[in-house]
């Protein structure tokens, strides 16, 4: 069949070729658009913060104080994980080399307790400006090792003549002496009760009493 001097089959073939060419051009434009959008998403991070690649994908490089992304060191305590204070066991040289840590633990009054910086890190999934690991200052040099004041006081009152209270607190040497003398014939037993109540007798490892809520 001839239409306007051209076979119909030839016209259909030309139409299919034009349609195929149009589809190819459309696919090419769509792929270029997706590539541009992906690049734009990497560039358009929050103002003043550049996203870091690699395992710390939730870290940002801090560059603008007006940015909505804050430094990891400004996060509240519930969003960070901190190590326990470093115990230098009275080694002043090690303390000076490291720059932080505790020479001694514990204390009855606030003024008696040392304060130091500890290593902290932002929790996984929390977005903040790097570095994600930082020092957080003014942490008290206090540790808890399972000693309860009420329990120790009861031990001292009922079994103090046998040195159970001092055994419990880790004062093994004096506990043996207290046991052999049956609490110093009652005098040592009474003195230890007073020392416990006034805070003069504490765990030997420098830990504080555990708090009961």
From Swiss-Prot:
Extracellular side: 23-143, 203-213
Glycosylation sites: 37, 91
Compartments reported by the entry: Membrane
TM region positions: 144-164, 182-202
GO cellular component: membrane
Keyword Isomerase: no
Topology of the protein relative to the lipid bilayer: Multi-pass membrane protein
Major localization class: membrane
Record keyword Transmembrane helix present: yes
Family affiliation: Belongs to the TM2 family.
Protein's UniProt name: TM2 domain-containing protein 2
Lineage: Eukaryota, Metazoa, Chordata, Craniata, Vertebrata
Gene it is expressed from: Tm2d2
